[in-house]
Swiss-Prot record:
Function noted in UniProt: Component of the cytochrome c oxidase, the last enzyme in the mitochondrial electron transport chain which drives oxidative phosphorylation. The respiratory chain contains 3 multisubunit complexes succinate dehydrogenase (complex II, CII), ubiquinol-cytochrome c oxidoreductase (cytochrome b-c1 complex, complex III, CIII) and cytochrome c oxidase (complex IV, CIV), that cooperate to transfer electrons derived from NADH and succinate to molecular oxygen, creating an electrochemical gradient over the inner membrane that drives transmembrane transport and the ATP synthase.
Cellular component, GO, one term: mitochondrial inner membrane
Binding-site positions, Cu cation A1: 161, 196, 200, 207
Residues binding Cu cation A2: 196, 198, 200, 204
Membrane topology field: Multi-pass membrane protein
Pfam families hit by this protein: COX2 (PF00116), COX2_TM (PF02790)
Name of this chain's protein: Cytochrome c oxidase subunit 2
Length: 228
């Protein structure tokens, strides 16, 4: 999760987020190279001897500054389109969960199991409890097995919401009367935090999301206890 003075993206917990971080670094490198080039040309223009100040046209330079941006865009759009289509693919999910946004809490249904559903509300912050994160704790965590492809179906019961887990690279809009889906695979255990990312009313900032990633064995035990 994000901490104070963190200038980087969150540590990835899924292959998709890892690829998004690589793409971010790739694009940032290209932008840095462009910035350095522009600064170099601006500096050289200010300290030159104005030998070409009466030049009206230059076919070579015009060809270069037309082709160069096109080549740069190819280097940016190619990995971008690859990631875009990769994020839309559903890889034979191991299980499906459904999340419903309400004002101002989340409901979860495990579609592959019988009577496994619950609501998730924000836990009030306690000043004395140093282990709590402000506005990020919930009374019920979404427990999921790691190293398994999960499909999530997102909708809303009242107004627009957005189910977002930054460390998974997931941001799915919750729209009333519409089902949106996405998929992810968690590759490490732990707690993953997120929040509603669509302004949905007075208590919009009080809709945290907590995913608890566990082993398959512990997940089965959790399902059995919840079904009883």
């Amino acid at each position: 999760m994000t901490t104070w003075s963190c200038m980087n993206l969150q540590d990835s917990a899924s292959p998709i987020m890892e690829q998004l971080i690589f793409f971010h670094d790739h694009t940032l490198m290209i932008v840095t190279m462009i910035l350095v080039s522009v600064l170099y040309f601006m500096t050289s223009m200010t300290i030159n001897k104005n030998e070409n100040r009466y030049m009206l046209e230059g076919q070579t330079i015009e060809l270069i500054w037309t082709i160069a941006p096109a080549v740069i865009l190819v280097f940016i759009t190619t990995p971008s389109l690859r990631l875009l289509y990769l994020m839309d693919e559903i890889h034979n999910p191991t299980m499906t969960i459904k999340t419903i946004g309400h004002q101002w809490y989340w409901s979860y249904e495990y579609s592959d199991f019988i009577k496994v559903e619950f609501d998730s509300y924000m836990t009030p912050y306690e000043e004395d409890n140093k282990k709590m994160f402000r506005l990020l704790e919930t009374d019920n965590h979404v427990t999921l097995p790691m190293n398994s492809f999960i499909r999530i179906i997102v909708t809303a019961a009242d107004v627009l919401h957005s189910w977002t887990i930054p460390s998974l690279g997931i941001k799915a809009d919750a729209t009333p009367g519409r089902l949106n889906q996405s998929s992810f695979m968690i590759n490490r255990p732990g707690l993953l935090y997120g929040q509603c990312s669509e302004i949905c009313g007075a208590n919009h900032s009080f809709m945290p999301i907590v995913i608890e990633s566990v082993s398959t064995k512990k997940f089965i035990e959790w399902i059995k206890n919840l079904s009883e």
